[in-house]
UniProtKB/Swiss-Prot annotation:
Pfam families linked to this entry: Pox_C7_F8A
Metal-binding keyword on record: no
Biased composition annotated in UniProt, kind: Acidic residues: 174-197
Superkingdom classification of source: Viruses
Residues covered by region (Disordered): 172-197
Gene Ontology biological process terms in this record: viral process
Protein name as annotated: Probable host range protein 2
Record-stated family: Belongs to the poxviridae C7 protein family.
UniProt keyword list: Early protein
Coiled-coil segments on the chain, per record: none
């Protein structure tokens, strides 16, 4: 059947969870996140790896690169069932954040690519590649209780969101606005793609 790790990435500062980021099969995991900002912004990440021990004895460390600069990831919990990392970075411009366990082009070409627009507060999966990536916004109560409360050194503002005002919506979300608004949103999606091509 092959190795099947599980990888989730919580973008805590945007109340967004990237779920099932792992490859469908293989001892490699990672993704590329293009983030659009219009001002200085602190991005807080929690990375949750649930290893598949059927065919491996050790798991690979998760590396993080932001606009070509290596960022430290801190291992904050390790058990038989999961490894949890945290990382924070402050950005001043549109940013590309990469998470990866392997630097080989063979694997990196299979990692998913997502775009997150923090200005308009929506996301899109640009290319899911060899994954079944999906999103949750807001971050689920389960993830908040298990990962945010004890494992991240950030303000209580992030813990247990009461409303969906802080949610990020999918770029294909139908909010029944007029066609002009839809065209404006489409332009924004194209803008974020243009910034990274």
């Amino acid at each position: 059947m092959g190795i099947r790790h599980e990888l989730d990435i919580l973008l805590v500062s945007e109340n967004l969870a990237l779920k099932n980021v792992e490859l469908l099969k293989g001892d490699s995991y990672g993704c590329t996140i293009n983030i659009k900002v219009n001002q200085q912004k602190k991005l807080d990440f929690i990375i949750i790896l649930r290893p598949d021990w059927t065919e491996v004895r050790n798991v690979k460390k998760i590396n993080m690169v932001c606009n070509g600069v290596v960022i430290d990831t801190t291992l904050i919990k390790k058990s038989f069932y999961e490894e949890v990392y945290s990382s924070s970075v402050t950005v001043f411009q549109n940013t590309t954040v990469e998470f990866f366990s392997d630097t080989s082009k063979k694997y990196k070409e299979e990692y998913p690519i997502v775009n997150i627009n923090t200005i308009k507060r929506y996301y899109e999966i640009k290319d899911s590649r060899m994954t079944c990536i999906n999103f949750e916004s807001p971050i689920s109560d389960y993830d908040q209780v298990n990962y945010l409360k004890d494992y991240i050194n950030i303000s209580d503002d992030y813990y247990l969101y009461d409303a969906c005002d802080d949610c990020i919506i999918s770029s294909d979300h139908d909010d029944n606005d007029n066609a002009d608004d839809d065209e404006e949103d489409d332009d924004e999606v194209n803008d974020i793609e243009d910034d990274y091509e």
